[in-house]
A protein has these predicted regions:
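Solvent-exposed, polar/charged alpha-helical surfaces in well-ordered, non-transmembrane soluble domains
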Residues: 186, 190, 194, 276-283, ...
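N-terminal secretory targeting modules
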Residues: 2-5, 19-156, 160-181, 373
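A structural motif corresponding to the C-terminal end of an alpha-helix
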Residues: 188-199, 281-293, 320-329
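Active-site segments of SGNH/GDSL-like serine hydrolases
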Residues: 251-256, 281-313
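Structural recognition of the beta-strand scaffold that forms the well-ordered cores
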Residues: 152-156, 161, 200-204, 246-251, ...
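Bacterial N-terminal signal peptides
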Residues: 8-17
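Extracellular serine-dependent O-acyl
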Residues: 292-298, 306-345, 350-373
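Conserved SGNH/GDSL esterase-like catalytic core that processes O-acyl groups on lipids
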Residues: 54-56, 127-129, 172-268, 272, ...
């Protein structure tokens, strides 16, 4: 008996796959490599996708019409996922979970009264949550936002700068995964940058400090800072020419001063080591960004005797800097007033991040104006 041919079925399957791929390509009208998509934060272009690495990294652009679709995918390890936040026409649009491993459209609905709309996309989670990929957009038309000579700020910090534990609208504290309440859009750093109309980059790692982590000796932020992916796994180095900050604002020390988790042995805070390694980190930053001024921040989470100790350490770093670099303007120091954090795991919530941003804004306006005079 003659065997039935499998060729028609094979051709049908191939045709179906091709049609599916073609449809996907037709739906995504504008790929991530397009110049209209202005890259923000710590990102790298990988094949046809833009990899969003650090907290608040993303893209911004303008689109015509009353809707667009943003194609994203999640490249976190195992069953982890990411979150993305959107800002549409200067207003917060919302946060969405990205747990799909292949490109998927996320719909954005705009007001039909305007021809053009500005969309900003922010990675709400952080580098250690894994990669978030931006593949492109479906829309009637897209174009770049208008370029302005913006102030450029880089914030180097820990979980507070990441926006950990500040957004409980979908997942209450003590529920879900440790990063389910992350929202870098509502970090004090992002808030104050928007208030100052500044372009900004967050180099922040939850749990890490100047010379140790909150409950262990590693990692430290300086040990990971020069990695393109803010981790110890990648050999790829960061491109320091892609973002040239006017000011580098450092908010590190909370985790160094931490008492730990009560399980692992914890040595007493070593102020001499903290001062020395903080200054060494400043030297690294000078070698990478010689044009930048520095601002050193205390923490509203550190109180009483520890706050006094922390502040005195920053003054010591400032004095050492002035001694070694007499030709450079000394780092400025901002002392945060104490805040009783009501977010998750002892972190500030969105309102408390707003308080921090207001405090920091007044300081930054003052020192920036002084630097310009």
């Amino acid at each position: 008996m003659k065997k039935p041919s499998i060729l028609p079925l094979f051709l049908l399957l191939i045709s179906g796959i091709w049609m599916s791929a073609s449809t996907t390509l037709q739906v995504m009208d504008f790929p991530a490599s397009l110049d209209a998509f202005e890259r923000k934060g710590l990102v790298v272009m990988n094949d046809s996708a833009l990899v969003l690495i650090s907290s608040a990294s993303g893209v911004e652009f303008r689109f015509a019409g009353d809707n667009c679709q943003v194609f994203l995918s999640n490249k976190a390890a195992d069953e982890d996922y990411n979150y993305v936040s959107f800002e549409l026409d200067g207003k917060y649009y919302g946060r969405m979970k990205v747990d799909n491993s292949i490109s998927k459209p996320f719909a954005i609905q705009a007001d039909s009264s305007a021809e053009w709309h500005t969309l900003k996309i922010f990675k709400a989670t952080e580098a250690q949550n894994g990669l978030l990929l931006f593949h492109g957009v479906s829309a009637d038309r897209v174009k770049a936002t208008e370029k302005t000579n913006m102030l450029r700020l880089e914030f180097i910090g820990n979980s507070i700068t990441c926006g950990m534990g500040n957004d409980v609208e979908e997942t209450p504290c003590d529920n879900g995964k440790w990063y389910d309440q992350h929202n870098a859009y509502w970090s004090y750093a992002a808030i104050v940058s928007r208030a100052l109309n500044a372009d900004f980059l967050l180099s922040s790692i939850s749990g890490a400090g100047i010379y140790r982590a909150w409950n262990s000796e590693t990692p430290s932020v300086p040990s990971l800072y020069e990695s393109a992916y803010l981790n110890a796994d990648s050999l790829q180095k960061r491109d320091f020419n892609s973002f040239k900050p006017d000011w580098i604002i450092i908010a590190l020390g909370t985790n160094d001063l931490s008492e730990g988790d009560g399980v692992n042995p914890r040595k007493a805070f070593d102020s001499a080591r903290f001062i020395n390694e903080y200054f060494q980190f400043l030297q690294t930053l000078i070698s990478r960004q010689p044009q930048a001024r520095f601002a050193l921040l205390t923490s509203p989470m550190v109180e009483k005797e520890k706050d006094i100790l922390f502040h005195s350490c920053l003054i010591a770093v400032q004095l050492k800097f002035a001694e070694i670099y007499p030709e450079k303007p000394k780092p400025e120091i901002h002392h945060f007033p104490a805040i009783t954090a009501t977010g998750c795991s002892g972190h500030p919530d969105k309102d408390e991040h707003q308080q921090m941003a207001e405090s920091l804004k007044g300081f930054l306006v003052s020192v920036i104006n002084q630097a310009q005079n």
